[in-house]
């Protein structure tokens, strides 16, 4: 991504972001074979098509992962990017009513609501009729209705560069409905390694860190990651069983044990689990040019 490639809008006013990623979790026509005709279109509207596909790692299970990255020597130490992450799978039919009640709506009820409102991120707005410059009827967002839909939060595990460091960050959220205002997020440069930053429901832990200058350049670096995903208590919002994280880094016939099978809170209290994606995920409003190579992803359940 170049300096002018931050084109995704809808975040903070006047802020755009840059993304270029490949996801291991996806669905094909075969995954919808035998389902009712409207199953696919309904899933599109609810943004849950990928929930029907391959690559999902259920909450509370144990997995081994591997992938490789090649960082060019000319990459600036000022970049702020996540190059690999495991993401949660929020269910948008989980909603919060104006009176604060959290409930899971039947798909038909959620879709009926969606027909009468405008949903942006996690906020539900009144749908207001207006006309565009050509005189055509269009809908725009009016006042917030007080309803919110589940949108997810920070990735449960991320590998990236920020503030002149390479870092591995694990996040946990035991809240049944994600509180987007709870910005519990460990700073890659300031947080102590393996000392979680916590709020009432969340934990964010820098599991490993090294100066950007020490990260191997112009060669393939292979990561082997073993995760026992934390088991959560659903609506009870409890930790049933903490997780574990083990990370090896290999290059030039050498290995480095970055995270030594540490007990850690890692995951989200979603009904579904997690999926892997890698690429360029610019963080914040960074426009520093980013280019690197990624390859060799594989996962298996242990």
Model-derived features with residue positions:
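Low-complexity, Ser/Thr/Pro/Gly-rich disordered linker/stalk regions
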Residues: 1-302
């Amino acid at each position: 991504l170049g300096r002018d490639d931050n084109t995704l809008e809808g975040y903070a006013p006047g802020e755009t972001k840059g993304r270029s990623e490949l996801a291991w979790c996806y669905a094909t026509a075969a995954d919808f074979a035998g389902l009712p005709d409207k199953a696919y279109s309904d899933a599109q509207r609810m943004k849950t098509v990928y929930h029907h596909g391959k690559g999902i790692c259920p909450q509370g299970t144990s997995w081994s992962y591997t992938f490789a990255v090649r960082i060019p020597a000319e990459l600036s130490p000022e970049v702020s990017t996540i190059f690999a992450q495991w993401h949660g799978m929020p269910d948008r039919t989980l909603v919060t009513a104006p009176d604060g009640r959290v409930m899971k709506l039947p798909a038909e009820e959620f879709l009926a609501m969606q027909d009468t409102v405008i949903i942006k991120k996690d906020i539900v707005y009144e749908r207001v009729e207006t006309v565009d410059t050509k005189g055509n009827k269009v809908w725009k967002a009016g006042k917030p209705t007080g309803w919110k839909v589940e949108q997810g939060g920070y990735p449960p595990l991320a590998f990236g560069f920020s503030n002149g460091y390479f870092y591995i960050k694990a996040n946990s959220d035991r809240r049944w409905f994600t509180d987007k205002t709870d910005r519990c997020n460990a700073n890659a440069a300031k947080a102590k390694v393996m000392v979680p930053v916590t709020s009432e429901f969340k934990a964010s832990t820098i599991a490993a860190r090294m100066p950007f200058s020490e990260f191997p350049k112009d060669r393939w670096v292979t990561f082997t990651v073993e995760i026992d995903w934390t088991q959560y208590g659903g609506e009870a919002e409890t930790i049933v069983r903490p997780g574990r994280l083990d990370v090896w880094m290999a290059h030039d016939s050498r290995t480095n044990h970055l995270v030594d099978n540490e007990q850690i809170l890692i995951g989200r209290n979603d009904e579904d689990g997690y999926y892997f994606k890698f690429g360029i995920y610019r963080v914040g409003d960074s426009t520093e040019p980013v280019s690197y190579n990624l390859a060799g992803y594989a996962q298996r359940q242990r």
